[in-house]
């Protein structure tokens, strides 16, 4: 997540606005926590003179809540994926891919 943020900052140094991350509750990595957002915001505020805000709208949401939000709002999730291997296509084996498969297979969540 830090790499994504720093890449955005260096690619668009004159940008003014909000950069949103899709991090959510239930993942135990530093870069998926409120403290990470706060730490990165300090860097971005200094670098951009306060022009850029980092947002994580799903930070306190569990994955099933996000899936339901996608269903309710007709988000075209077939155009997205979450894979820890970072390839062009989902690997189908990492925890993120397995979670997504589980929810897609559920009768409650048809995305």
What are these model-derived regions, one by one?
Residues 1-111:
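Nucleotide-activated chemistry modules centered on ATP-dependent adenylation/adenylyltransferase
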């Amino acid at each position: 997540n830090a790499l994504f943020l720093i890449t955005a900052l260096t690619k668009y140094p004159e940008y003014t606005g909000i950069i949103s991350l899709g991090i959510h509750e239930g993942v135990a990595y530093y870069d998926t926590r409120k403290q990470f957002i706060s730490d990165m915001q300090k860097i971005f505020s200094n670098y951009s003179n306060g022009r850029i805000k980092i947002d994580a709208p799903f930070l306190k949401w569990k994955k099933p809540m996000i899936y339901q939000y996608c269903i309710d709002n007709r988000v075209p999730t077939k155009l997205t994926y979450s894979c820890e291997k970072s390839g062009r296509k989902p690997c189908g084996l990492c925890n993120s891919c397995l979670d997504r498969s589980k929810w897609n297979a559920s009768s409650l969540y048809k995305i």
